[in-house]
Amino acid sequence: MNIVGIDIGTTSICGVAVDIVSGDIVKSVTKQNNSFINSEKEYERIQDTEIIMQSVTGLLSELDAENAIAIGFSGQMHGIVYVDESGSALSPLYTWQDARAALDFKGGKTYAQALGCFAGYGLATDFYNEQNGLVPENAVCLCTVADYAAMRICGLKKPLVHITNAASLGCFDIKENRFTIDNPRLPEVTAEFKAIGEYKGVPVCAALGDNQASFIGSVSDSEDALINVGTGSQISWLSASPVDGGGLETRPFDGRNYLAAGCALCGGRAFAMLERLFREIASLAGDNTGSLYPQIDRLLETKTETTLSADCRFCGTRSDPNIRGSIGNISENNLTAADLAFAVLNGMSKELYDMYSSGGKMAKKLVCSGNGIRKNAALRRIVSGMFGCEIKIPLYAEEASYGAALAAAVAGGKFGNIYEACKIIKYKDE
């Protein structure tokens, strides 16, 4: 009795088949997303929707989806595909990286600012296209690529978009779960984990945004918080009401709770910068070594404190892109490799902790996902100590596709709600 989840990422597309009783992944398949279309326009970041669909249909076959209990999707948020009245794509996928809405519009504002959302968000991209005559003539609706994939495999003519994806398009009221602008191409929205149709007789759940799907696929206890460390880093937790301040963003979840999220733009990149610095220093001594991560890990095995401080906002913040990080409180005794490495990890943790504490959350435990913390024992120790919480690491790293599968199990009637479904998540022994 398997459930299938597929996550359509920017660079890869991952599918899993999950045993609904044990919670084990019985099969996992990942394909590179080689659908980017070369463009002469510097701001344009688009992908070929048909190439993406070829990968999706291939995964459905490899995962034996036609014999599954239910199928779920998640995917890269913010981007849009235009569809016609038959449900066919009329455009490439304008991805979240597309920066056309950051171009100057009128009155000293960009297209995104004029609309009231961020560049890369689907409705900002659509606004630019509308103003410049680029919306396909027969377009009747727009949606994310995961919505499109779910709609296509069901043979539907129009998408039904979950609030987790709808909000990512911009101009969305998360309390009322509706769009705040008039646009004839806006899709129908749902707050439920519900089936939108069937694939060869198997129910297909409304697609989720990858952020919320990753939370669902990682966190078994709704009182826990999730820390994800990749190139950037993020802390998120469920809240009964919207959370304001401290660099936090509130996102829709299930119509009952919200997902509070604090994002650090540098995150794991800060540790990568440190490793690059150490390699550069080693090369000065004639040692053109490869990765120094194993050596840094060993250096930190017994390191428990430092008087050196590091502000790791090296890439700015969402609210202030121009702010920069710093190394402080340097003395003749603490400017060492071990102290610097420990200070950077401490700074990475503190940036997340400051956002967490401003939201007033007191988590029971911290779930840690993403290779930046899965593979870094020293960072886990620092995070655990700073937050005062026990650490849990999901057994499976395919969090978004796993979360999509759990949502599908709810849509297929195998669990009463998403919180019940999450109880089958397994964790590594620490």
Predicted segment positions?
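N-terminal glycine/serine-rich phosphate-binding loop of ATP-dependent small-molecule kinases
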Residues: 1-91, 138, 202-206, 291, ...
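Activation-segment/catalytic-loop signature of the eukaryotic protein kinase fold
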Residues: 304-396
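Glycine-rich phosphate-binding/hydrolytic loop that grips phosphoryl groups
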Residues: 213-217, 263-268, 272-275, 342, ...
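A short helix-loop
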Residues: 110, 126-133, 138, 151, ...
